[in-house]
């Protein structure tokens, strides 16, 4: 699977759980001004102005940054020789205590959108997006935060990779989002194999026939 491909590429692999009980697409319903603050709320575990009211009760320990920081600290303490400590750096608070430049951020669907936004806000080693990003307006245009005119600390033209499958009806806008980000053709793979055990949207994560694409993006 995708995680095994990461291990085989020589990476430390961490699958993170966080608050994701409602899809960003459902929460924002095509409202361009909603997508970015909704995602920032989930990343930081702190409600941001402009985010949908459904997220008002989010707790800091439900956010991506706090959970990633906590997981890295636990792994560094419990597996002292495992190399996890290299992903931590002295800082104040979770977000500034993560060694972002050493981390490859990846995600599927909603998680891929989070990965893209983390890459905008932090200089990471690489961003890998599977069947994503999906943020699109009611006019089927990529959300404004995805445009290459925005200031990205990780350059999408150099360090963003993506995989999508033909016929993805859950996230039909992923290819337009890749173009908006300014990703080169070689980093945009829209030819994922769909296998018998998965529909198009899940194929980029679940179908082993895509192992060669995973390896290319992760190495």
Give the location of each predicted region:
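Short amphipathic alpha-helical segments and helix-helix/interface helices
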Residues: 2-4, 116, 149-150
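Extracellular/periplasmic catalytic domains that process cell-envelope and extracellular macromolecules
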Residues: 6-8, 96-99, 120, 152-156
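The feature captures the conserved acid-bearing segment of alpha/beta-hydrolase catalytic domains
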Residues: 125-215
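Sec/Tat-exported extracytoplasmic proteins
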Residues: 72-79, 122, 131, 218
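Alpha/beta-hydrolase active-site loop
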Residues: 33-96
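Gly/Ala-rich beta-loop-alpha elbow adjacent to hydrolase catalytic centers
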Residues: 104-111, 115
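Conserved hydrolase catalytic core segment
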Residues: 117-126
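Short, surface-exposed "cap/lid" segments of acyl-processing enzymes
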Residues: 1-31, 169-172
């Amino acid at each position: 699977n995708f995680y095994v491909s990461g291990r085989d590429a020589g990476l430390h692999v961490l699958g993170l759980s966080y608050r994701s009980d409602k899809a960003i697409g459902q929460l924002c319903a095509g409202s361009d001004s909603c997508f970015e603050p909704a995602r920032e709320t989930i990343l930081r575990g702190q409600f941001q102005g402009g985010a949908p009211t459904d997220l008002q009760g989010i707790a800091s320990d439900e956010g991506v940054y706090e959970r990633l920081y906590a997981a890295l600290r636990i792994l560094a303490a419990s597996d002292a020789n495992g190399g996890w400590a290299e992903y931590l750096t002295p800082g104040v608070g979770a977000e500034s205590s993560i060694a972002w430049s050493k981390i490859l951020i990846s995600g599927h669907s909603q998680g891929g959108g989070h990965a893209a936004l983390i890459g905008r806000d932090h200089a990471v080693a690489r961003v890998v997006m599977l069947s994503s990003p999906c943020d699109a307006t009611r006019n089927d245009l990529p959300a404004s935060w995805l445009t290459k005119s925005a200031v990205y600390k990780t350059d999408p033209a150099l360090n963003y990779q993506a995989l999508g499958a033909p016929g993805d009806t859950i996230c039909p806008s992923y290819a337009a989002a890749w173009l908006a980000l300014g990703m080169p053709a070689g980093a945009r793979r829209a030819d994922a194999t769909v296998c018998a055990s998965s529909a198009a949207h899940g194929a980029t994560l679940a179908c082993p026939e895509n192992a060669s694409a995973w390896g290319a993006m992760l190495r």
